[in-house]
Curated annotation (Swiss-Prot):
Isoform G1P plays an essential role in phage assembly. It is required to increase the number of adhesion zones between the inner and outer membranes of the host cell. The extrusion of neo-synthesized phages occurs at these adhesion sites. May be involved with G4P in creating zone through which the phage assembled and extruded. The keyword Disulfide bond does not apply. GO terms for molecular function: ATP binding. The chain crosses the membrane at residues 254-270. Keywords: ATP-binding, Host membrane, Membrane, Nucleotide-binding, Transmembrane, Transmembrane helix, Viral extrusion, Viral release from host cell. One of its GO terms (biological process) is viral extrusion. It is found in: Host membrane. InterPro entries: P-loop_NTPase, Zot_N. ATP binds at G8, K9, L10, G11, A12, G13, K14, T15. The gene is I. Pfam families: Zot. It comes from the Viruses. This is Gene 1 protein. Gene3D superfamilies: P-loop containing nucleotide triphosphate hydrolases (3.40.50.300).
Amino acid sequence: MAVYVVTGKLGAGKTLVAVGKIQDKIVSGCRVATNLDLRIHKLPRVGIFAKSPDVIRIPDKPSLDDLLAIGRGNNSYDENKNGLLVLDECGTWFNSRSWADKERQSVINWFLHARKLGWDIIFLIQDLSIMDKQARVALAEHVVYCRRLDKITIPFIGSIYSVITGSKLPLPKVHVGIVKYGDSPQSMTVERWTYTGRDLYAAYDTKQAFSDAYEHSSFSYLTPYLSHGRYAVKRDATFYMRLTRIYLKKYSRVLCLFCGFVSAFTYLSLSKPEATPQIKPVTTQIITSRYKPSELRITTSYRMGNAVGFEFMDAKKQKIASDDLIKDGFRMVYITPCSVELIKDGKHEKVTC
C-alpha cells in the first residue's frame, strides 16, 4: 500500500496534484473515494462517454461508518489495482488533540489497516508539522512537497526583466510534486509529479469549503456517460450539415461580400482587352558581292599537289587572289589551269584567262 501526505502552501497545487492522481486511477479502471467535489466528465482523459468510472463522494470529515461503507478498493493481491482514497483538509484530523480523541481513534485505526482493504491513500495537509508525530510515523510513508514554478524567479534574468518592465518575469504555471520516501525533507526523492493544471481546473471545485456538518452521506457519482454522454449530440453527417448551415446563416453577409469581391476580380481579369501584338518590320539586308565574276579573268594559276591557286584581275586592273574570293563566299571548282568555275548563292559562272 502507498500512503502519500501531500503538503504545500495555499495555492501550491495540492488538490490539483491529487485530482491528477484520481484521473490516473480512473483511467486504469480502479476505484476512487474522496471528499472532493469532482466533475468527472471534465477530466480530459476520461471524457463524457466513459461508462466505467467508480467514484464515491464521502463526507468532508468521514466517520468510521462512512469509511466502512466504501468497501474494499481491490479484491486481488495486485497492489497496482488498489483503489485510491483522497482526503483534503486533514490538518484538523491528525493534530495532537484529534489524535488522542477517542471518537476519531476508530477512524485512525481504519487508516492504519487500509492496506488490507486494498486502498492507497492521499492525505492533503498544508504543512507536515501540523500532523501529530505518531501519525507521521505511522502513516506518512511518502511525503509530497508541492511547488509552483511560476512563483520562482530566475536569477539574474528575472532581475533584469523586473528592472526593465517593473513586473515579475512571467513563467508557465506548472505544478511539481516532489515525492520523498519518508517524513524528512532530506529523505530520498523517489519520483516527481508534474501537472500543468490548465486541463484539470474544471474537474473540481477550487473554492470548495469543508464543514464538520456535511449534510449528505456517502454516494456514488454517476458515470460521465449517464450524466452527460447520453445527452450529447451525435456527431454524424447530419450534425455537421446542420452546423454548416448555422455558420453559413451567421456569416452570410460576410460571405456574400467576399464572393462579390472575388466575382468582380475574376470578371475584370477575364474581360481585360488583349494587347494587340506589334509587328516589327523585318529588314532584310541584301548583301552584295564585292566581286563580279563576269569582270574577272585569270592572270596566274598554280598547282602544288592538291593545292590550287589563282590570281585574277578585274576591269579596273586590280589584282584579286583566290583567297579573297573564298572570303567573299565564293566556292571555286578547278577545271584547267586557265579555267575555273565560281559558285555563289546557287549561281555558276566560268572564268577563263
